[in-house]
């Protein structure tokens, strides 16, 4: 639905780029933006792979929100997922201006909070940027986690200040 894009525009962002590999998701985002902000030209949408987009886009950003689909649904692909998170965040660190804010998320059940943090920290170290955690995010209270099923804590996120 483009929720992050919607709220970025609502928060007076000068320019919002929405990127999703799904053209249907991009179409829905564009319809939502047009419905709520008719004629507003601050939004640009790209039906493209985010990795490719970050490689080719020359812009630098003050704020980046990474909210990819689940990179791993089974433990056998956990290492590939962690490499994907590291790579995606490394590309974001390259594109964010000093003093920028990065919101980064994982909704993969099999990726623990600690493994996600380590993948992001590895990306930060690789980028050579000094990064501070401003806030750690998790799923809301309407998605409770059963103590006998810790994998139910599927959503994790970090809000990072990038120097």
Residue ranges and their predicted role:
Residues 1-3, 107:
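Class I SAM-dependent methyltransferase "Motif I" SAM/SAH-binding loop
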Residues 3-14:
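Conserved SAM-binding loop of SAM-dependent methyltransferases across substrates and taxa
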Residues 6, 55, 86, 90-93:
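Amphipathic, non-transmembrane alpha-helical secondary structure
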Residues 15-20:
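Conserved SAM-binding motif I beta-strand of class I
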Residues 22-65, 71:
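S-adenosyl-L-methionine
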Residues 61-91:
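Mobile active-site "lid"/loop adjacent to the S-adenosyl-L-methionine
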Residues 96-98:
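Helix-to-beta-strand junctions that scaffold the AdoMet/dcAdoMet cofactor pocket
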Residues 101-163:
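C-terminal catalytic and target-recognition region of SAM-dependent MTase-like enzymes
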């Amino acid at each position: 639905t483009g929720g992050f894009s919607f709220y970025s525009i609502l928060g007076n962002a000068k320019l919002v780029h929405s990127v999703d590999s799904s053209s249907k998701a991009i179409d829905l985002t564009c319809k939502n933006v047009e419905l709520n902000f008719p004629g507003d030209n601050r939004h640009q949408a790209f039906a493209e792979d985010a990795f490719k987009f970050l490689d080719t886009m020359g812009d630098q950003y003050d704020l980046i929100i990474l909210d990819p689909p689940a990179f791993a649904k089974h433990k056998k692909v956990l290492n590939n997922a962690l490499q994907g998170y590291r790579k995606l965040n490394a590309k974001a660190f390259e594109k964010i201006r000093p003093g920028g804010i990065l919101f980064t998320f994982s909704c993969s059940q099999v990726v623990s909070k600690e493994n996600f943090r380590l993948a992001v920290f590895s990306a930060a170290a690789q980028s050579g940027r000094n990064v501070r955690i401003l806030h750690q995010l998790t799923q809301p209270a309407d998605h409770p986690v059963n103590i006998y099923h810790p994998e139910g804590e599927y959503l994790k996120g970090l809000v990072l200040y990038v120097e």
